């Protein structure tokens, strides 16, 4: 999460210089309610329109990128949208219907030998850490069941693989598999105080001026093994995802 400001686009442009290619997704603190919020994020990621291979609907906060040689599609979803209430846009935790149609009718129309990896800040299920029945029946994410249903239907119809849905928001590490799809939660908490959260995720102690000050993963997809290797730099441990 990065609280939005009119200078956020400049921050992201500098990030692309240091990392080569940079594909952000909107977090809940990037999507705070207010008179300008609905347009701040699309403006901030406007630099993506000049990136080769990025397919983004005009002024939308979601997009995809192909690694065509490897037959891999990276899908970057937005788990927040806005509704006008009282004359101002209000942030909604969920997936707007236009995004679901875009996902179902364009993004997930793929040959069977392709592999899809999805990225979003929040998951499609608010009860992600529970069983499949609870995830569907106790879901507070607006259109969460619908976007997952679109994904599941396309997977069955076209036969492509889903290597994982990568999310943040929970502040800790955890891998959950629901309906045959791995959901990979990556830690981001800067202070070791798990009592702040009731979720069953792993938090890591972090200290300034030590290796644990860092916390990020290098991701390696091995299609032949049907595995994703996550190499942790800084606080935490390496992980392996089977799909």
Language-model-derived ranges and their functions:
Residues 5-105, 110, 153-161, 172, ...:
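Extended active-site neighborhood of metal-dependent phosphoesterases/phosphodiesterases
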Residues 27-28, 121, 168-169:
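Active-site glycine-centered loops adjacent to acidic/histidine catalytic or metal-binding residues
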Residues 125-165, 183:
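Catalytic pocket-lining loop regions of alpha/beta-barrel enzymes
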Residues 231-242:
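Short, solvent-exposed aromatic-acidic interface loops
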């Amino acid at each position: 999460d990065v609280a939005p400001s009119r200078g956020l686009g400049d921050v992201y442009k500098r990030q692309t210089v240091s990392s080569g290619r940079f594909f952000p997704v909107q977090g809940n603190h990037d999507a705070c309610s207010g008179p300008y919020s609905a347009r701040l994020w699309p403006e901030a990621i406007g630099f993506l329109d000049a990136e080769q291979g990025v397919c983004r609907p005009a002024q939308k906060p979601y997009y995809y990128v192909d690694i065509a040689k490897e037959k891999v599609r990276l899908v970057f979803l937005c788990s927040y949208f806005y509704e006008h209430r009282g004359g101002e846009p209000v942030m909604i935790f969920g997936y707007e219907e236009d995004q679901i149609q875009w996902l179902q009718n364009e993004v997930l129309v793929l040959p069977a030998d392709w592999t899809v990896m999805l990225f979003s800040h929040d998951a499609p299920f608010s009860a992600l850490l529970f069983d499949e029945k609870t995830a569907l029946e106790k879901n507070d994410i607006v259109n969460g069941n619908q976007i997952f249903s679109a994904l599941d239907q396309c997977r069955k119809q076209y036969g492509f693989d889903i290597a994982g849905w990568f999310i943040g928001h929970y502040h800790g590490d955890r891998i959950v598999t629901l309906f045959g799809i791995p959901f990979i939660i990556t830690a981001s908490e800067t202070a070791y105080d798990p009592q702040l959260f009731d979720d069953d995720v792993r938090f890591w102690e972090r200290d300034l001026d030590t290796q644990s000050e860092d916390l990020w993963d290098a991701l390696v997809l091995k299609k032949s093994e049907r595995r994703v290797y996550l190499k942790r730099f800084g606080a935490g441990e390496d992980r392996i995802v089977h799909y």
